[in-house]
Amino acid sequence: MQQMIFALVLNNIMPAFFLMIPIMASSVMAASSFVGEREKHSLETLLYSPLSIKQLFQAKILAGLAVGMIVSYVSFAAMLLVLEAEVLFLTGNMLLPSASWLIIMLLIDPAISLAAIAVTVRSSAKAQSVEEAQQRAVFLIFPIIALVIGQFTGIILINSGLLWGLGVVLAALDALLMRGAAGSFTYEKLLS
């Protein structure tokens, strides 16, 4: 019975909570990268570099994505280590994560990180501070909270099919958001 409860926690409850990590890490990095440089007046120096505005945009996006993914993977390893140690201590058995975790780590985490970065970049043109840019990306957490509530009430059950669908929708949304964010990344908007 205990092992079933641990399996439920690992494979059904933790994924919904886990999706918040890349949103938070990526949006903090993106806000610091875009708005933070304008606040510290280091953006002008960067714009004098031989890189094009498109290359600067891509580098900042990749930096935010890399930080989000590193934080996600380290958090996943720590969570798995702690949960496995507890399951082993209490039941004497090991617990394997479901295949859903593979979809989450390889498809949904990068997609949700890119969505957070795109929202942060779009809002950074209007934001006056890093905190203001970060606060706008918080709205991405609301659907995750709805997913958590759905999990606890039994309305939504996370499974591989739902995760694949969510991943495809997020990837399509990312393409649209990134196109819009790239369009708002101009010299005039950055310096104003």
Could you tell me what each predicted segment is?
Residues 26-47:
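Transmembrane helix boundary and interhelical loop/hinge segments in multi-pass membrane proteins
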Residues 126, 172-192:
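Junction motif at the cytosolic side of a transmembrane helix
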Residues 31-33, 92-141:
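A structural motif at transmembrane helix-loop-helix junctions in multipass membrane proteins
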Residues 128-135, 149-168:
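Extracellular/periplasmic helix-loop-helix junctions in multi-pass membrane proteins
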Residues 21, 26, 53-80:
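Selective transmembrane-helix segments that form parts of the transport pathway or gating/packing helices
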Residues 1-8, 77-106, 158:
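Membrane-interfacial helix-loop-helix connectors in multipass membrane proteins
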Residues 9-31:
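Long, hydrophobic alpha-helical segments
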